[in-house]
Amino acid sequence: ICERIGIKGSVITYQPTGGEKEVSNIDMPTHHEAIDAVIKALTNKETGVINDMSEVKAVGHRVVHGGEYFSKATLVDDDVIKKIEECNYLAPLHNPANIIGIKACMKLMPDTPNVVVFDTAFHQTMPESAYLYAIPRKYYDENKIRRYGFHGTSHSFVSKRVAEIMNKP
C-alpha cells in the first residue's frame, strides 16, 4: 500500500509471501512514482514476487462510481476514462484519484491491458421504482441523483460464494 502520495513522509508497505513486512519511505510526489514503487517492489530480486513485468497480464482497478454507464468489468480505453470522469461529481473523493492511478498504470505499462470494476455495477439491475424511491424526480432528471448501491464488488463475491456453499445456481 502506498500512503501519503503527494505529501511529505510518503511510504510503501508490503509483505512478500512468506517474508517480513517491508516498510520503505519513498518520495512519491504523484501516483506515477507510487505505481513505479509498486512495480519495483513486485520485481525486487530479493523480495519480489515476479521476475519482471512481462508476467503481469493485466491490471485491475476498483472504481467507486460508474454512474449508469457500467454494469460489468470493462477494458479501459479513452472513452471509458471519459465516462468515469463524467461520474466524478457522484464520487468526488474517489473517482478522480482512480483516474490518476489508471493513467499512471497505462503510462508505466503501456502494453498491459487495464480493466475496471465498479462498486455500482452490481446494483444496475435495480428497477427504476427502487432506485428512485423517495427521491424527487427532478434530482434524477437534472443530475442523475438516484440510488446506485455501493460495495457491489463485495456483494457480488459474497452472493456467489453463498450460492456455491449452498449448492444453489
Each predicted region: which residue ranges?
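N-terminal glycine/serine-rich phosphate-binding loop of ATP-dependent small-molecule kinases
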Residues: I1-G67
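Short beta-strand-loop/turn "lid" adjacent to the catalytic site in phosphate-handling enzymes
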Residues: L42, G48-H94, F122-L132
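Phosphate-binding/catalytic loop of phosphoryl-transfer enzymes
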Residues: N95-P169
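Short glycine/proline- and acidic residue-enriched helix-loop micro-motifs
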Residues: E22-S24, K83-N88, N143-I145
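Electropositive phosphate-/nucleotide-binding environments in soluble metabolic enzymes
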Residues: M28-H32, D36, T74, D78, ...
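Short, low-complexity, polar/charged sequence segments that are solvent-exposed and flexible
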Residues: G19-E22, E33, D78-I81, Y133-R137
